[in-house]
Amino acid sequence: MVTPDGYLHRSSKSFNESMNIQPIIDLDQELLLKINGSDSLFWDGFMWIATNMLTWIPLAVVLLYVIFKNNKVKEALLIIGMLALVITLTDQIASGFCKPFFARFRPTQDPELMYQIDIVNGYRGGIYGFVSSHAANTFGIAIFLSLIIRSWSLGIMLFSWACINAYSRMYLGVHYPGDIFCGTLIGLGIGTLIYMLYTYIRKKFIHSPNYISNQYTSTGYLNSDISIILFVFILTIYYILIGSMIKIQTSLF
């Protein structure tokens, strides 16, 4: 059946039965219903702000600043180019291929489940949700930059950021845990492959020394610059928390 958006839609029931994955689908739905929503205006506000990519623009700007500050222009441009490739590939695989190919409804669009889902601000997302492009993008960025910069503290921060974004998608009811899990695998895989491509190009065309110092990471990034990134991340979390509390106050009047 072709839906109004032009996608070929397969019957989810017949597809699931033919692939013998109905038990997995049932478990996915059960997990989603446990994660989705709450009676808390605070958490509604937190997840709503956290899932918005515009919230994280200051963090992205500081990351770009640190990359250019700690590398020669040629290598910085190579890193940015590879990062753009990570984002493009993860997004195209998730949204351009997987969503129309598998045609799995988002929980908020699934006729069998949509009225059991708690939604925030009327947001339901697009028709299909497998796999999550948010998860693919954020985990792809997290693994790529973690391998590039080689800082444990930054790696923990980047994966925390990716996890917050991924969890917010389930909380808002626009993705099943399975959507997130598969999107995460795609992101980690693409991020790692592009890092391998980056190291090949870097060794062939750019010579950069390894650093052994308590002031630098092993790839030459000042630890003080890493601290700036962490500080901006913490400020962003505070911004989300304050925004969540403001949502509570405004809802009372």
Name what the model sees in each region:
Residues 7, 12-58, 94-124, 246-253:
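N-terminal transmembrane-helix/juxtamembrane module of multi-pass inner/ER membrane proteins
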Residues 20, 81-101, 234-241:
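N-terminal signal-anchor transmembrane alpha helix
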Residues 50-67, 81, 134-137, 157:
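Hydrophobic alpha-helical transmembrane segments
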Residues 118-252:
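Membrane-embedded catalytic cores of phosphoryl/pyrophosphoryl-handling enzymes
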